[in-house]
Regions:
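The two-metal-ion catalytic cores of nucleic-acid processing enzymes
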Residues: 1-280
Length: 280
């Protein structure tokens, strides 16, 4: 086994090992699990499970085989009205107002109603951003839901914040909004597919229901269920395709069974002789 000091070095070390053997002499296993998935597995916990945090670390309070019920987590929706001259919502449009709505916790309806923050003529962007941050902090949702938030709402708010030289702090940790991944395009089953940028919050979850297939089909409860089964945090899982979510579940199950997972398992299988076929 090869240990690395930082998870970000894992793929580089794996590529180095393979290249030393001219990509033929060595096999590499267990590189695929995401750092968060590996960390939660090592801690013996799953997303959305109850834990105790103490000086001794993180202790699970429930077993994986126990009957599980989705927890009640508070939710709020955020929508930014930013339209161009043709009335189309776009991140480059002028922000007129933002609406924050309490959606309850999945068991009972919201009691805090809606807050509308207007960008009136002559108002400074700094004042608008500060009021939005205060509203989110006061409502304090566990999950912030948007529709096209990764594509429109957050880019528009970030543009306004940067124009006034300030940060956008909508998470509980009071840190700047994190751009975890820029928009990328790749080929999938013969089609060119675009994966939108990923804007993450710290201390609360951002789920873009306008871009998440799993979120649209299964709702928040479905995301929680899949998150628990796969070991992938809900905020990350909402950006995955169904196929990637299934792969994550398989990897988690392999880790639990103590089975090594070949790296790049979608690579064409090497030729085997008769003896290898019998052993396999």
């Amino acid at each position: 086994a090869v240990e690395v000091s930082r998870t970000g070095m894992l793929s580089r070390v794996a590529n180095l090992i393979l290249s030393l053997g001219e990509w033929e002499d060595f096999q590499v296993f267990s590189v695929d699990p995401k750092p968060t998935q590996r960390f939660l597995f090592d801690m013996g916990v799953r997303p959305m499970s109850r834990v105790r945090v103490s000086n001794r670390g993180i202790e699970p309070l429930e077993g994986s085989e126990e009957e599980w019920e989705p927890p009640a987590i508070s939710r709020a929706s955020l929508s930014v009205d930013c339209r161009d001259a043709y009335g189309k919502r776009t991140p480059r449009g002028e922000i007129r107002f933002a609406t924050l709505t309490d959606l309850g916790d999945g068991r009972s309806p919201g009691k805090l109603g809606s807050i509308r923050i207007s960008m009136s003529p002559g108002r400074e962007p700094e004042s608008f951003i500060h009021e939005l941050e205060r509203a989110v902090g006061w409502m304090d949702p566990d999950v912030l839901l948007t529709r096209k938030g990764d594509v429109i709402d957050f880019p528009a708010l970030l543009s306004m914040a940067s124009s006034s030289g300030q940060a956008l702090r909508l998470g509980r940790m009071r840190r700047n909004l994190v751009l975890r991944r820029k928009a990328i395009t790749n080929w999938s089953y013969g089609r060119l597919v675009r994966s939108e940028a990923y804007h993450a919050l710290e201390g609360r979850l951002h789920v873009d229901m306008g871009s998440s297939f799993i979120g649209k089909e299964g709702g928040i409860e479905g995301l929680m269920e899949l998150s628990r089964a796969s070991g992938i945090p809900m905020q990350d899982l909402s950006r995955l395709s169904p196929g990637s979510a299934i792969s994550a579940i398989q990897i988690r199950q392999s880790m639990e069974d103590g089975v090594l997972v070949p790296w790049k398992k979608n690579r064409a299988e090497d030729l085997k002789d008769g003896r290898e076929m019998i052993l396999a």
